[in-house]
Curated annotation (Swiss-Prot):
This is Catalase. CDD domains: catalase_clade_1 (cd08154). Homotetramer. SMART domains: Catalase.
Amino acid sequence: MDPSKYRPSSSFNTPFCTTNSGAPVWNNTCALTVGSRGPILLEDYHLVEKIQNFTRERIPERVVHARGASAKGFFEVTHDITHLTCADFLRAPGVQTPLIVRFSTVIHERGSPETIRDPRGFAVKMYTRGGNWDLVGNNFPVFFIRDGTQFPDVIHAFKPNPKSHIQENWRILDYLSHLPESLNTFAWFYDDVGIPTDYRHMEGFGVHTFTMINKEGKANYVKFHWKPTCGVKCLLEEEAIRIGGENHSHATQDLYESIAAGNYPEWKLYIQVMDPDHEDRFDFDPLDTTKIWPEELIPLQPVGRMVLNKNIDNFFAENEMLAMDPAHIVPGIYFSDDKMLQARVFAYADTHRHRLGPNYMLLPVNAPKCAHHNNSYDGYMNFVHRDEEVDYFPSKFDNTRNAERFPTPLRIVTGQRDKCVIEKENNFKQPGDRYRSWAPDRQDRFINRWVKALSEPRVTHEIRSTWISYLTQADRSLGQKVASRLNIRPTM
């Protein structure tokens, strides 16, 4: 008998209850006791098994992006970009690739409201013929920091106070006051887009700079953008309070019910493309995650569309055990030297092994759908039946060989080993440009959110003054208005 053919599955359900080992259970409502009112007997194995399984149902939640919802669908190429990449799933218009998407909030726990002001995760796993490609992004195109070394600190600052377990603005503003580059992300965070109406009306961004390579080996920097065809919609504070008070899972429910009703959400995928030889032409570093690439300088190019047309079958199996990883790339798409991306390439697999175990890639939602082969064996919860005798490479007893070489970026890297910030910081131009692009009422809401945050009692005069200095450098009138409402004199 091949045990791999008889894995536990709902398709093998019997019409009566059984133990985990398959033995029939004739009474699933009463414990085995001495008499009708006597003590429970330890030999009631079914009771012990049932309770012990129940107390182990929960796994560690994600350290970030714990609250989320998933859906399945497909990606379809609509425009030919083979001059930019040799990626197989982008080989021609009309090609479709199955995928799963997970939307999420970032900071709070698994059961937290979906109406809080918080960045949203926008992660896509495509099951391509050449392996899984994961694009693990957010609903903002920028991030608060530009170096992965700072990631634990910025998350700690946003997480609840370890003493009181209350999220407090003084901690956020204190930490990020040391990082003026964070102001550009605050121009999104404290903007109206800080609370999306739901997941269907939300943009997605790859955030990082990636590299595309064509079959000739030519490499270009790219950024990825997801644009919802139904438009972007956001909640103002009063709406968020009302909706969150009625339903803390409103975005999950909206996504699930929309797909169930046949109202399939759709996004268009666009890219921005930059020749690495031209990066010095701009006043920002293209590998800086705190910066956008202005679309008037580097226009969007259409690539394809994503349609979510199927709800997940089981929330735990396809949402909680779903493991996205920016290290999962395919030939034709590669990393860049973006410091945040480089750190994430290591971090995700590490946290998945902690949360799900060393064999998390064997779980159906994570496993590639294409043929694959490796010599990763055994470990906790390895449920794959393998009968090879050779578990090493190379071998004269096994004909496994190296794959055909595919193009990767080739360049010479020279320099002195050092820990340093990038040379081209330019921290205030982009947030100032964004602020000035808004209508007056939108500007006023942005100012009010800053005033509310900076008015918290534990935000010191020094921290307030620092932020007013940053806001003034972005836009003089912005800094003056915030300072005036706080009764503080600007230093610039």
